[in-house]
């Protein structure tokens, strides 16, 4: 497998990533603490309307200097990390990890960790000391980021929090 930056005309290949997964628990923030709660559901691919909504936003992100890092198995995109270019945080030392997705058949093989590490290296080269992450509140996702060193952000970005209040807002050192 190879890891490399995506070209603008490859952005829509992101939608070929298989997001399917069975979930048994989600996290919620209560009084500044993570609380694990039972919540069984099956995610089958991309949510309705997500592709139509996010595609233009991804092009805007790319055009303003966002970094799109892909993991490829031969010519097949099996994972992606998208790093935005807009500084966040009171000190302006955070960059948002907009996306981190790995196809179902490639999980638990270090793909996500490699993509996160590459996004962190790019963020560091741009002067950031933290990745800002709005993590899907599923148990597997939150645990992945915690294993990579991320912690709950107790002062989330107001705009990003308003967009995704159910997500677990985290920061991860780069």
Region roles according to the model:
Residues 8, 16-93, 98, 103-104, ...:
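Acetyl-CoA-dependent GNAT
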Residues 99-102, 108-121, 146-147:
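Conserved acetyl-CoA-binding loop-helix of GNAT-fold acetyltransferases
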Residues 123-136:
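Conserved GNAT acetyl-CoA-binding A-motif
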Residues 126, 147-148:
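Structural motif
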Residues 134-138, 148, 155-174:
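C-terminal "cap" of GNAT-fold acetyltransferases
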Residues 141:
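Helix-turn-helix
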